[in-house]
């Protein structure tokens, strides 16, 4: 028995008085029929109004100058269509953490006279579904006039969504389709960034995704993960795809276990249909979903955030305008804090190395850019298509080096120059401009060894200098002597930077890395070196003594052989102390014949890469 409350949009608008503050739903909850009539009406009572909307992403609320006498928009989100209008002074931004907004409505700190929201049709018991669980309930309680726009195409979503028709003063039957957002196209560069992000996300992690090409790509690259959880302010098409892939079970979440949890719906018509009566996804209020303490109660909470630019110290400039749909400073801060409170949680900022104009996105400073997020003390990871920069626990110099290593190869030489001038890196820092362009990323791989030890392997980078120094100083005197055939006590910067800067053609170095408490640790290194005239390359290996007898050296040897053969190298040589039985065993496992000569306590090894087909014929 609610039909008697159904009125025309004009009758609803006749109840409005000049100066009133009207709350409007966001996204799927935006009452588009009411808003369109409000914009079109010339009635004199519709003047000097305040329209309050959490996120303005629709096309029904014009924000140009000609409507300034009728209304002024207030929003909590600086992105999407409101960005330029905020800068021009036509829209008011209310800076706030999203989890605090319900409290602002409850306390009256933000006054609301009327609430217009879109809802689903009611069930047989008179209960409709809210389509924006964010703060709509609090907005309804704060207003004297509550109007529901009933849309027959709206889904019935699960969670804290039920609202009885008795709680409304009037209803309007919608003549507009709900607000659908088209999906973003995904370029290869975002698939590469997403693949690098996926490599640092463990099975059982809890994630938060927004809207944009990065998140669309992540839905693809995370599809092979297991037991992921979802705790996200926005529910999107990308999350729908990820759940449908089977990667999400939510079994290891700390809150809302077994369910994906969100507060808003932003997506396509297909997603809305999929959510209809779907028990896998529950929607909860904003002050629950975005509360850092609630976010942090999920172990391994991964906040994946897009960035516009990042500087060499770790400061971030967020996107503005239509480049920013779901990652404004307010909700970025809450996700960031939540991940910091989470056991084994981390934040990941992802961005292409260059923007669409071909300008660098990793720069010396972001001080001249708007929408800065300056919380570099808590930064964890920055990811581009060229790799991952681990920042936690790093010095400013180490951060700068790590970020330069994932910048666009053509931008690195200039970044090195600028960083030297700014005294962020060593004044004598070596940099080979060609090394970035020829970095052999195809060598990168990972392998699980005994006792579940996962080791990632990749070609060495200039930013590995400090980790390689730490590896050197962990070795015993005997290990150093076995590797270098002399007693070396120190490994200063000058010497080590020459060691880690290689050209990848004549000299190849592959490091083995483990991740411990969110930071990288090099535990092994293998390399070959030759001159242009040499057909054979000399080899050497070293493995942290804590990780001996796990097969790491043998695996590195296989990687070196594969890489060398692709470079046209015809074989390996090596000098091994006769007492170094473990290293001799590694070489003996070669698929190729090993020729040995013992001279003065040193085995001189020669390993020609005889075609394997010939070896099989001989057998």
Question: What do these predicted regions represent?
Answer:
Residues 1-433:
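Conserved alpha/beta enzyme-core scaffold
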Residues 438-619:
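Long, contiguous binding/interaction regions
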